[in-house]
């Protein structure tokens, strides 16, 4: 039995397809905005602040392992629906929120671990979604591209440990934009250039100490199209 804690984006659907194909027993904790999994009989729609309900659902189903997938927006703590355990744990979440979005996820993992629930890597059932090191296009990066890539990696590594930014656009060794709360789409919109076409790179890169079980940098088809529209040469 695996507990699937799902948010938005298409990533959770890919995991669910594999889970069903392999006939693995599962349940879904649906944290998506639109409650996109409500038609699944094994799905439970809850608020992120209902820790008691979430933990009870998992324990009642003898579910000792979970994985996180999809985007879950940082909650408005003043409007959060809390149950008794939520009230108990909320001071820890508030404290973590001051460090950034990634810190909230890490704190939730700790809370689950204290309740003897282990968090698995989100790609445990879908290793094919993980790209290995290498060049997957016909275009090879030149010297300028390599300089841009190096600049981008240094920029991401210089950010705070709990900063949610996982992406940066660099063109001609200048940082054009860094991923903010608007996500990759907003960052790429800011990076559009009429002067430079086929110049610059988007680098999506995990920072040091980043917990890849719940905070995995992802790139989808939309990002590829948006990068082309922005006039970038490649993605790393």
Each model region followed by its residue ranges:
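N-terminal basic/disordered segments at the start of proteins
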Residues: 1-31
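Short beta-strand segments
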Residues: 5, 30, 68-70, 170-171, ...
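Conserved mixed alpha/beta catalytic, RNA-binding, or beta-rich assembly cores of soluble enzyme
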Residues: 9-11, 19, 45, 98-102, ...
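Short, well-ordered alpha-helical microsegments
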Residues: 12-13, 51, 75, 105, ...
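Short glycine-/acidic-enriched loop or helix-start segments at secondary-structure transitions
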Residues: 14-15, 38, 77-79, 212
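Feature captures the catalytic cores and cofactor-binding loops of soluble hydro-lyases/lyases
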Residues: 31-56, 60-63, 83-89, 93, ...
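N-terminal glycine-rich phosphate/adenylate-binding segment common to multiple enzyme folds
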Residues: 54-124
């Amino acid at each position: 039995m695996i507990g699937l804690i799902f948010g938005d984006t298409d990533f959770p659907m890919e995991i669910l397809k594999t889970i069903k194909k392999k006939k693995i027993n599962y349940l879904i904790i649906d944290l998506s905005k639109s409650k996109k999994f409500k038609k699944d009989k094994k799905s439970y729609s809850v608020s992120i602040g209902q820790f008691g309900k979430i933990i009870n659902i998992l324990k009642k189903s003898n579910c000792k392992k979970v994985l996180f997938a999809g985007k879950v927006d940082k909650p408005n703590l003043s409007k959060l629906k809390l149950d008794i355990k939520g009230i108990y744990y909320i001071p820890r979440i508030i404290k973590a929120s001051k460090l950034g979005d990634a810190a909230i996820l890490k704190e939730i993992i700790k809370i689950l671990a204290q309740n003897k629930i282990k968090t698995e890597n989100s790609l445990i059932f879908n290793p094919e979604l993980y790209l290995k090191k290498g060049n997957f296009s016909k275009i090879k990066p030149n010297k300028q591209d390599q300089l841009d890539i190096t600049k981008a990696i240094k920029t991401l590594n210089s950010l705070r440990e709990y900063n949610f930014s996982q992406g940066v656009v660099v063109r001609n060794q200048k940082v054009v934009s860094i991923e903010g709360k608007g996500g990759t789409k907003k960052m790429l919109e800011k990076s559009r250039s009429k002067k430079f076409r086929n110049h610059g790179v988007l680098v999506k890169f995990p920072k040091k100490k980043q917990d890849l079980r719940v905070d995995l940098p992802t790139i989808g088809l939309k990002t590829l199209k948006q990068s082309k529209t922005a006039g970038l040469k490649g993605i790393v």
